[in-house]
């Protein structure tokens, strides 16, 4: 039985690879090698999960969903397990697998991932869709636990960067433009990161300032 995974370098995929042996592992760099292989089982964990980017750039995010659909179609597995998210639900509590979902009421992140779920359900009636909540572990790159540990915002909107950079030369020199309305922290040096953490705390703005728009808990 040939078992393959797409998204093996991501948070979920990398942890699955530690606990399970796959016959082939793919990501965006080598995905074309998977086309036409018709594996018995495909674990698809290859959808980007930056909620804040998806909600700010809905069309671009939808394009990544369409790309995922095309990847699955061209891989043509016999069965599929899709790694999805509880963000497809319209509320953050009191829901289960039988809860109706109205995409029109969802933010782009949840709406677009529900579109992928629906395609998988239609084309693979015996598929398994796993909707993950906030998770933590090795290789964690985001969510409120990551923010509590690191404090420094990984990304800043241009207007927030302009505001903070006027108050701090260190912040001004620590972020680089991404071409999508956001700037990303480019600092790797531990000493500078320590100073940057103190700088954000002193200014009263840290990664914990971000929240999930559907709830009151610190999360994004």
Residue ranges of each PLM-predicted region?
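N-terminal Rossmann NAD(P)H-binding glycine-rich loop of SDR-like oxidoreductase domains
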Residues: 2-22
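SDR active-site strand-loop-helix element
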Residues: 6, 44-45, 80-86, 130-132
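A short, well-structured beta->alpha microelement
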Residues: 21-39
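NAD(P)H-binding glycine-rich loop region in Rossmannoid oxidoreductase-like domains
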Residues: 33-77, 86-94
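Catalytic helix-loop patch of NAD(P)-dependent Rossmann-fold dehydrogenases
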Residues: 62-63, 93-130, 134
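Conserved catalytic-site region of short-chain dehydrogenase/reductase
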Residues: 82-95, 135-139
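Catalytic loop of short-chain dehydrogenase/reductase
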Residues: 88-112, 149-156, 165-168
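NAD(P)-dependent short-chain dehydrogenase/reductase
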Residues: 119-217
